[in-house]
């Protein structure tokens, strides 16, 4: 028993020793498969030499010997020290400088003891790759500093240099500034961002551009404000399409000008274009900054896009309105709401898309935030593409509108009054000038942007070279070498930027010129008189149709007092809007209006029976009165004759005068032609009419009327009555008989009967009475006479046989008369 116990103890000891040795070997193999347990994989055998420099990049070294075996580009310590000074140019990249200092010292001045030098670890090498990407991009890493060399940079090794504390921190050389905001870092230079002031322009150029913007922005602001104020001062007459579209266009440019001029408020420019770390705002909106940049962008961009889309609506409205000249058709009726929907929604969608992609950038030269200062493809897609589309569509409608006006002026000269023709000429001239300016400004804008697009890459390359040159200045200071002169070789032209801004501000000024007319002066004159409570002496432009409508609306008052005068408010008076040449028709009222016409408008309306009460009939006694529902169907409400028809009527009338004999003798000798004589009107209290060749009978007719008055009035013969009551449709040919019988006679007053009823007169009692004088019907029995109505005499073909009190006759007479106000 005792002999077996020592043997078991010895066996256990040997098993423990074997297990420990196996674990150590396995650990060595796992950590470094290419090494053995007997080799130190974190060190490399070499010859050590005494350090000549006790510091590395400003930090003291805790050892006394080193080796140059790791720095393949240096054969002596002097060369190694010089190379370190050249690498010190990375001091201008703070985040790179913080991680590359230990690596450089571990390679150029490593610790060497007992013939072995310490190797830098793989982790120390990899830590420099991302922060120092500018080295890889500009010059590339040398072979002895590439992390792919596993023998040079083994894993898991501790280095004496890593324990050093470097007391020098990185800095950003102008035009870069130090920042911890990653979004502000300049490409490949982590820790530095571009300064707020654009480095491509000098301070003097900044001041020059700011003064330029202040001048033209103020001019645009004042011009557009004057236009808006002019529209608002006479809004009742100005709020008409298409002219009111210019109000919205000027409103857009007015708001945009406010966005441009906001930078001149105290401290506003730095708040708009600069971040809190004094770097330029790029890629807005961001969660760490204020919304001042975004607000200015929305004001400028949204108003600009809305203004150019309103321009398309303006040209379309011009085109459709010009096509409808001379007609009562309102082409824009019901479409204006769509104008607003399209014009305000499309810029909103574009604005939201830009903000969603964070493509709002600031520019210290212009002092605003806009899209595409950094990535020009966004400016091309969100600015140039919409403006180009607008240019094509708006130009098409503008050209068509001018062609329409030219066609009206050339093909229909007889339709135009002298004033309308003058306005068409003026409008075509102004449209031509406006179109030329609009196309010119847009083409200038395109040219300036193309200039930016084609030269952007060269400007960026020049700026990058300038940044590297500034880094070399730091190296020159460290190595006591000549300091290079750094300058940006290729810079954008300030003149091109001014031209681009002029095209934008010039467009706003051009839009405001539409109110630079004489009508605007009159508007402000009336406004001033209205403010001070004084009435102006300007002749009022009152449309005759409005005057007649006013008299008709006051018919009850005028019936009681026929001598009452009408008063017209400013709402009835039709002043010319501020946009002269846009809102006009071919028959608009003239300023020179006869005062006598205006004073007698009530009598003229009364003459047409407009103010007669409903229970008064103009039918003489013995004529059946039609029911009100039938009577209303036959009144002719309006009579509108085109200029061509008026010319044809005058020519036809002239030919009749040449063929038809004149004078009383000729009429008596020609039984086929008889003139109608005027009898006293049955309408009570109708005003007497002035002498008129088309309305009042001649003197010889008046004398004949006095002689035969008793014979001509059917009401004086009560024996002429129908023997049996007849239905109204059978008695009145205008409703029954004539409704189904075609007649060449025009519609007359429904309260009179027509000559065409003679076929149904067998229902009336016959009489042997015959009228005397020239109105005696030769060879006609009394039974064939139209009894119970005013005598109507057969006339020559083509002449109307209706009463003189007919609305149609009166209207035709005045429309066909050259001296008539109608």
Curated annotation (Swiss-Prot):
Presence of keyword Signal: yes
Please provide one cellular component term from the Gene Ontology annotations of this protein.
cilium
On the Extracellular side, which residues?
Answer: 29-212, 263-293, 357-381, 452-503
In terms of domain of life, where is this protein from?
Eukaryota
Q: Which residues form the signal peptide?
A: 1-28
- What are the subcellular locations of this protein? Cell membrane; Cell projection, Cilium
Entry keyword annotation includes ATP-binding:
no
Residues bearing attached sugar chains per UniProt: 34, 167, 472
Q: Where is the FZ domain?
A: 43-160
**According to the UniProt topology, which residue ranges lie Cytoplasmic?**
234-241, 315-335, 403-430, 525-822
Topology of the protein relative to the lipid bilayer? Multi-pass membrane protein
Please give the start and end residues of each transmembrane region. 213-233, 242-262, 294-314, 336-356, 382-402, 431-451, 504-524
Q: Which GO terms describe its biological process?
A: adenohypophysis development; angioblast cell migration from lateral mesoderm to midline; anterior/posterior pattern specification; arterial endothelial cell fate commitment; axon guidance; cardiac ventricle development; cardioblast differentiation; cartilage development
> What's the protein called, per UniProt?
Protein smoothened
Q: What is the lineage of its organism?
A: Eukaryota, Metazoa, Chordata, Craniata, Vertebrata
């Amino acid at each position: 028993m005792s002999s077996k116990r020592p043997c078991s103890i010895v066996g256990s000891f040997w098993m423990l020793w074997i297990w420990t040795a196996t674990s150590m070997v396995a650990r060595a193999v796992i950590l470094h498969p290419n090494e053995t347990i007997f080799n130190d994989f974190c060190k490399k055998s070499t010859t050590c030499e005494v350090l000549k420099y006790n510091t590395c990049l400003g930090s003291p070294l805790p050892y006394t010997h080193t080796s140059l075996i790791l720095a393949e580009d240096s054969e002596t310590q002097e060369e190694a020290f010089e190379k370190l000074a050249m690498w010190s140019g990375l001091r201008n990249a703070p985040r790179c400088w913080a991680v590359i200092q230990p690596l450089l010292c571990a390679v150029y001045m490593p610790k060497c003891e007992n013939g072995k030098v310490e190797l830098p670890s793989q982790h120390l090498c990899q830590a420099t790759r991302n922060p120092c990407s500018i080295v890889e991009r500009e010059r590339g890493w040398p072979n002895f500093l590439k992390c792919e060399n596993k023998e040079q940079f083994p894993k898991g090794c501790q280095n004496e240099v890593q324990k050093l504390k470097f007391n020098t921190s990185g800095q950003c050389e102008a035009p870069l500034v130090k920042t911890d905001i990653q979004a502000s870092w300049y490409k490949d230079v982590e820790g530095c961002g571009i300064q707020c002031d654009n480095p491509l322009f000098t301070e003097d150029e900044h001041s020059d551009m700011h003064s330029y913007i202040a001048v033209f922005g103020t001019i645009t602001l004042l011009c557009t404000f004057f236009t808006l104020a002019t529209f608002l001062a006479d809004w009742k007459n100005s709020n008409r399409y298409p002219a009111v579209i210019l109000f919205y266009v000027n409103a857009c440019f007015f708001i945009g000008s406010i966005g441009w001029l906001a930078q001149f408020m105290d401290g506003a420019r730095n708040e708009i274009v600069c971040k809190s770390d004094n770097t330029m705002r790029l890629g807005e909106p961001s969660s760490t900054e204020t919304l001042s940049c975004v607000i200015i962008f929305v004001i400028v961009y949204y108003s600009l896009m809305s203004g150019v889309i309103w321009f398309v609506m303006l040209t379309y409205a011009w085109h459709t309105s010009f096509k409808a000249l001379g007609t009562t058709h309102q082409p824009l009726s019901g479409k204006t709401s769509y104008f607003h929907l399209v014009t305000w929604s499309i810029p909103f969608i574009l604005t939201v898309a830009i903000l969603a992609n964070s493509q709002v950038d600031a520019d210290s030269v212009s002092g605003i935030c806009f899209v595409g200062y950094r990535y020009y493809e966004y400016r091309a897609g969100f600015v140039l593409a919409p403006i180009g589309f607008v240019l094509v569509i708006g130009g098409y409608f503008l050209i068509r509108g001018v062609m329409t006006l030219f066609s009206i002026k050339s093909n229909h000269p007889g339709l135009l009054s002298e004033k309308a023709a003058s306005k068409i000429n003026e409008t075509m001239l102004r449209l031509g000038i406006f179109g030329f300016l609009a196309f010119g400004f847009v083409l200038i804008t395109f040219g300036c942007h193309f200039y930016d697009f084609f030269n952007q890459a060269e400007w960026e390359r020049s700026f990058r070279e300038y940044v590297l040159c500034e880094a070399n200045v730091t190296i020159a200071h460290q190595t006591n070498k000549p300091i290079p002169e750094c300058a940006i070789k290729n810079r954008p032209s300030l003149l091109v930027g001014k031209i681009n801004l002029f095209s934008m501000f010039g467009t706003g000024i051009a839009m405001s010129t539409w109110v630079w007319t004489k009508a605007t002066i009159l508007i402000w004159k009336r406004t001033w008189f209205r403010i001070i409570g004084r009435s102006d002496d300007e002749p009022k432009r009152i449309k005759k149709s409005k005057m007649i409508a006013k008299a008709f609306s006051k018919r009850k008052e005028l019936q009681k007092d026929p001598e009452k005068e009408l008063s017209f408010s400013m709402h009835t008076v039709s002043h010319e809007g501020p946009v002269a040449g846009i809102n006009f028709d071919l028959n608009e009222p003239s300023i020179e209006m006869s005062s006598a016409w205006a004073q007698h408008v009530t009598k003229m309306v009364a003459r047409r029976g407009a103010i007669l009460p409903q229970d008064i009939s103009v039918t003489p006694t013995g004529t059946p009165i039609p029911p009100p529902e039938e009577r209303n169907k036959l009144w002719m409400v309006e009579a509108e004759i085109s200029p061509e028809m008026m010319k044809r009527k005058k020519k036809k009338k002239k030919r009749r005068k040449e063929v038809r004999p004149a004078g009383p003798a000729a009429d008596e000798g020609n039984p086929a032609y008889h003139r109608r004589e005027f009898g006293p009107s049955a309408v009570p209290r109708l005003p007497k009419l002035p002498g008129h060749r088309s309305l009042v009978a001649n003197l010889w007719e008046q004398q004949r009327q006095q002689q035969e008055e008793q014979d001509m009035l059917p009401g004086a013969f009560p024996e002429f009555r129908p023997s049996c009551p007849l239905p109204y449709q059978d008695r009145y040919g205008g409703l029954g008989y004539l409704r189904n019988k075609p007649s060449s006679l025009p519609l007359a007053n429904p309260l009179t009967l027509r000559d065409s009823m003679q076929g149904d007169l067998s229902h009336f009692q016959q009489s042997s009475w015959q009228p005397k004088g020239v109105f005696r019907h030769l060879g006609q029995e009394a039974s064939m006479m139209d009894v119970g109505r005013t005598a109507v005499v057969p006339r020559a073909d083509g002449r109307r046989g209706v009463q003189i009190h007919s609305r149609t006759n009166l209207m035709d007479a005045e429309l066909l008369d050259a001296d008539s106000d109608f």
